[in-house]
């Protein structure tokens, strides 16, 4: 765990269930001293939050080299999207440890990539693949996700000042899905275009995570387009 307040607690207690006899630790070396075949690596993404944007990559490569299979939701769905050097570094770590890496999620990870590839198997010719996702966060109770990570409730000026890492991280996730689909249907990506529309609140809104004040960001509409040869 990354939260020092959870250090030493039973993992079941943290999850809100009965104790399961597994101690949570902020010491990664201590955690890895146990015998395990696979590590479920699911922190808040370091590309978005924290002092070191590369921390997740460093940790995952370390785990792979030590011989742990890794399942993660921080990205790494299709490392090839970030270039051959990036993909080769991941592959070399897997080979060294004799293990595998599985990046997954709902979207990306299933709905925005695996489903289109599965459904496209029934098509003789594909001219365009369109995937639309709509997410409702007014019922999501996490301030850290809604306000800190997604920058909801910020002014437009605040967003423009703080959004660099957020947009790089989020764009990277969906670019992985785009490259995965393109390779899956036998196309080659020339470039990926990105656009964003920010919607501001017409009045104060009370949501599960707090309050979005009038004039602050209450919605985001994003679009990524992979242009193929």
Where would I find each of the regions flagged by the language model?
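A contiguous active-site-proximal alpha/beta segment in oxidoreductase catalytic domains
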Residues: 78-141
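Short acidic/polar active-site loop segments enriched in Thr and Asp
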Residues: 37, 69, 127
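Short, hinge-like loop/turn segments at secondary-structure boundaries
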Residues: 13-18, 88-91, 119-122, 146-149
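N-terminal glycine-/serine-/threonine-rich beta1-alpha1-beta2 phosphate-ribose binding loop
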Residues: 1-65
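Short, ordered loop/turn segments at secondary-structure junctions
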Residues: 3-4, 44-45, 68, 74-78, ...
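Rossmann-fold NAD(P)-binding glycine/threonine-rich loop
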Residues: 48-69, 73-100
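Active-site-lining helix/loop region of Rossmann-like oxidoreductase modules
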Residues: 120-229
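Conserved active-site and cofactor/substrate-binding residues in soluble primary-metabolism enzymes
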Residues: 34, 55-58, 85, 89, ...
């Amino acid at each position: 765990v990354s939260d020092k307040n959870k250090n030493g607690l039973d993992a079941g207690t943290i999850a809100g269930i009965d104790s399961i006899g597994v101690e949570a630790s902020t010491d990664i070396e201590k955690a890895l001293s146990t015998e395990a075949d696979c590590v479920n690596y699911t922190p808040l993404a370091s590309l978005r939050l924290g002092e070191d944007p590369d921390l997740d990559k460093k940790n995952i490569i370390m785990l792979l080299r030590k011989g742990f299979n890794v399942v993660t939701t921080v990205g790494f769905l299709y490392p090839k999207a970030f270039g051959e050097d990036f993909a080769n570094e991941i592959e070399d770590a897997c080979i060294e440890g004799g293990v595998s890496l599985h990046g997954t999620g709902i979207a990306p990870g299933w709905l925005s990539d695996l489903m289109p590839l599965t459904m496209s198997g029934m098509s003789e010719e594909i001219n365009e693949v369109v995937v639309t996702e709509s997410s409702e966060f007014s019922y999501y109770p996490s301030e850290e996700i809604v306000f800190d990570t997604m920058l909801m409730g910020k002014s437009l000026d605040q967003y423009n000042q703080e959004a660099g890492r957020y947009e790089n991280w989020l764009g990277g996730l969906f670019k992985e899905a785009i490259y995965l689909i393109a390779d899956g249907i036998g196309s080659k990506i020339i470039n990926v275009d990105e656009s964003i529309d920010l919607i501001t609140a017409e009045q104060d809104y009370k949501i599960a995570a707090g309050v979005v004040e009038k004039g602050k960001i209450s919605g985001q509409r994003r679009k990524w387009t992979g242009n193929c040869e």
